[in-house]
């Protein structure tokens, strides 16, 4: 039985990581499949080390293409070491970010362009794509305000980018959602955490009713 690969996407401040945690705990109680949660960049030791390099605010001289290639390298190792084995075992994989993030952040945010980022990641993933994507949408002003108010850890390199950068990121996410309606479910993340969690959970069980 092949597994199910679900990704969680959204601009900074959408509450994506918190929603994934709540939803995964609920799914673990009700799903017929084992739930595997992971994140990008990260999820395995090699990729977590790359994550530290990418997000360290002291690395302010990092070239945007270097950044894009580091994300793709972390993604490749994460995919072959954790995601694909879990899918082959029939598990339900919930991943905090995947290729859509690179398209939005490096392709649009960094203005590298969508085509080269898509090409880099096609090589890294060998065409592996999520079965379903939850996109948590929030306007850039609200997202940045939430980051400033709620982040307990250090603000990272991407969080510290200006409003226009985050607006470009969100615009690309909205474009991706419009172009991929069968894969991407857009959810209004301006709602309370409880309502967003419920909407996300319902979207998953409606998509995969046989899993419950």
From Swiss-Prot:
Pfam family, one: Thymidylate_kin
GO-annotated cellular components: cytosol
GO molecular function: ATP binding; dTMP kinase activity
InterPro entries xrefs: P-loop_NTPase, Thymidylate_kin-like_dom, Thymidylate_kin_CS, Thymidylate_kinase
SUPFAM superfamilies to which the protein is assigned, alphabetical: P-loop containing nucleoside triphosphate hydrolases
Domain of life of the native organism: Bacteria
Gene3D superfamilies (alphabetical): P-loop containing nucleotide triphosphate hydrolases
Keywords: ATP-binding, Kinase, Nucleotide biosynthesis, Nucleotide-binding, Transferase
Catalytic reactions of this protein: dTMP + ATP = dTDP + ADP
EC id: 2.7.4.9
GO biological process entries: dTDP biosynthetic process; dTTP biosynthetic process; dUDP biosynthetic process
Enzyme category, top tier: transferase
Positions that bind ATP: 10-17
Family (UniProt): Belongs to the thymidylate kinase family.
Function: Phosphorylation of dTMP to form dTDP in both de novo and salvage pathways of dTTP synthesis.
Name assigned to this protein: Thymidylate kinase
């Amino acid at each position: 039985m092949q597994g199910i690969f679900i990704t969680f996407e959204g601009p900074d401040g959408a509450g994506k990581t918190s929603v994934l945690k709540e939803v995964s705990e609920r799914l673990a109680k009700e799903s017929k499949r084992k739930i595997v949660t992971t994140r990008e960049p990260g999820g395995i030791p090699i990729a977590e080390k790359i994550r530290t390099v990418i997000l360290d605010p002291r690395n302010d001289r990092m070239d945007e293409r270097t950044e894009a290639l580091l994300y793709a390298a972390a993604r490749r190792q994460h995919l072959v070491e954790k995601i694909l084995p879990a899918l082959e075992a029939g598990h339900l994989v919930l991943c905090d970010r995947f290729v859509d993030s690179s398209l939005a952040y490096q392709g649009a945010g960094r203005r590298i362009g969508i085509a080269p980022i898509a090409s880099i990641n096609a090589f890294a993933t060998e065409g592996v794509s999520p079965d379903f994507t939850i996109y948590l949408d929030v306007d850039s002003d609200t997202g940045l305000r939430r980051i400033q108010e709620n982040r307990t850890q250090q603000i990272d390199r991407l969080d510290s980018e200006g409003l226009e950068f985050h607006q470009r990121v969100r615009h690309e996410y909205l474009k991706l959602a419009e172009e991929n309606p069968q894969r991407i479910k857009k959810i209004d993340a301006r709602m309370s955490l409880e309502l967003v969690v419920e909407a996300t959970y319902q979207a998953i069980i409606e998509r995969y009713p046989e899993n419950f």
